[in-house]
Amino acid sequence: MIGDVTFFNRWFGFIVFRSPALKKNLYFKQIPYETISEYSLGRYALEKQGFTISAIVLDGRPGVRKVFSDIPIQMCHFHQKQIVRRYLTNKPKLEAGVELKEIVSYLCTGNKEDFTQRLDKWYEKWESFLKERTIDKATGHWFYTHGRLRSAYRSLRTNLSYLFTYLEYPELNIPNTTNSLDGSFKNLKELVGIHRGFNSTLKKKIIEEILSN
């Protein structure tokens, strides 16, 4: 199962649960903002209908994993790469950033042991660099000089336990990305964009009709 949320404007979004095996959206609901409770309600609704969620692919939103803590959880590789890219940019200037970006490029082709070893070696090499501090002359307070690099590394370390779940349970055929749902979201937004002049009620009907097919 893949669970994700997309927004069409600040307060107009949809949470969707999709079965890659069935190639079908099994649950969707309009929401004003993304919350943990909406994921919980979605799971409850599906199980009430008789569906069994054997595993879930998520984008890494904090707290959502608790809703699915009793089943295998896969962190979407695409979203993990996006997180790192957001901190490092596409062209990191620091050598440490370039090397970390290179490690992330092995995410989809490696395994947990190999990836962990690469990450551990990188940290061992750059540990002192990551701990460098800068003093704010105006306030006298210090901050980590390479805060964005630290955040990129920390995201990988935090999500490591969920990045290779799909290899640990081959019998479940778990995708390693939310791409099948993201592709639907992209097409949906393009279609809704064509009908920009429609009011929210009509847009909602169009979106629900598309998601149900």
Where are these regions (language model features)?
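A short hydrophobic/aromatic micro-motif that marks alpha-helical segments and, especially, helix-coil
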Residues: 19, 34, 94, 195-197
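Conserved beta-strand -> loop -> alpha-helix junction used to position metal-binding or nucleic-acid-contacting
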Residues: 55-101
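Acidic/histidine-rich catalytic cores and adjacent linkers
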Residues: 51-62, 68, 102-213
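RNase H-like nuclease fold core
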Residues: 1-62, 66, 159, 180
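Short, surface-exposed beta-strand-loop junctions and turns on beta-sheet-rich folds
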Residues: 22, 72-74, 194
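Glycine-rich loops and low-complexity Gly/Arg-rich segments
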Residues: 25-29, 39-43, 51-55, 80-83, ...
